[in-house]
């Protein structure tokens, strides 16, 4: 399936939306994906990012699977991120039927070597991709056991399929998406540091019902009406807490 929603067509986005709604999660927006998947392209795993007012817990989901799509894990991070920018590597495999390959193994390996590295890949994209401002990508391509392995910091529209045809056959048309698989994507350290984890504190902090933290700050959750009391007159209480914990954000529980 393609990622973006099209009328009368199944897509990752529409199926993911259905799965969330099946779990009673109706308020969310901005579904972004970490790795590009064109029409007919498979994905063994991908990362999807949404902004939602719901506190979504993996353990409490009644439905984790829908036709061809399964939620494996949920992490909480910051809102309104440019999510694809926080992914450092994408890994794809293109497995084209051997009988359709025209180039020799030597020629294929030579093409892989020539196309690996930091290059301007404008000629290996679609008309849509040509309109993008930046066409420079850092990519490694290898040919092993009849498959092309692509690893890169990002890929242009149709880039892997056009490069695959050039490497295997010397042709610049995109090969079919059905032979392409997104294998996995790698987080950046920055995104890793933004992920919020629940904290269990031995000492009780008055008015604080729950604590989450990432590498940058703590979030102290309080019941409605208790925020002012936790912060204290002229911020006295929160200043003392910041001396102990560092940066703190105070939020009222919904």
Describe the residue ranges of each PLM region.
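A short linear hydrophobic-aromatic micro-motif
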Residues: 30-33, 70, 206-211
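Generic marker of residues within folded, mature protein domains
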Residues: 84, 102, 131, 172, ...
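Core RNA-modification/binding signature centered on pseudouridine synthases
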Residues: 1-45, 52-54, 79, 115-203, ...
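RNA pseudouridine synthases
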Residues: 36-53, 57-124, 158-159
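Interdomain boundary/hinge elements
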Residues: 248-254
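Residue-level marker of intrinsically disordered, low-complexity segments enriched
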Residues: 106, 209, 246-248
């Amino acid at each position: 399936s393609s990622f973006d929603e099209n009328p009368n067509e199944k897509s990752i986005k529409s199926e993911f939306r259905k799965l969330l709604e099946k779990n009673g999660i109706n308020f969310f927006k901005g579904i972004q994906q970490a790795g590009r998947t064109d029409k007919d392209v498979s994905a063994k795993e991908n990362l999807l990012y949404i902004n939602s007012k719901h506190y979504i817990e993996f353990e409490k989901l009644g439905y984790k699977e829908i036709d061809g799509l399964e939620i494996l894990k949920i992490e909480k991070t910051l809102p309104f991120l440019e999510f694809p920018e926080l992914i450092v590597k994408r890994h794809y495999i293109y497995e084209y039927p051997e009988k359709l390959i025209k180039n020799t193994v030597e020629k294929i390996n030579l093409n892989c070597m020539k196309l690996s590295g930091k290059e301007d890949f404008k000629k290996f994209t679609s008309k849509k991709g040509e309109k993008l401002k930046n066409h420079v990508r850092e990519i490694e391509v290898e040919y092993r056991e009849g498959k092309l392995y692509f690893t890169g910091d990002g890929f242009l529209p149709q880039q892997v399929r056009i490069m695959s045809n050039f490497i295997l056959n010397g042709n610049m048309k995109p090969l079919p998406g059905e032979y392409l698989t997104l294998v996995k994507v790698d987080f950046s350290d920055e995104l890793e540091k933004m992920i919020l984890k629940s904290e269990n504190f031995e000492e009780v902090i008055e008015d604080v019902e729950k604590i989450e933290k990432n590498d940058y700050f703590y979030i102290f959750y309080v019941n409605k009406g208790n925020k002012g009391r936790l912060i204290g007159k002229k911020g006295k209480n929160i200043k003392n807490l910041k001396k102990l914990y560092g940066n703190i954000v105070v939020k009222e529980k919904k």
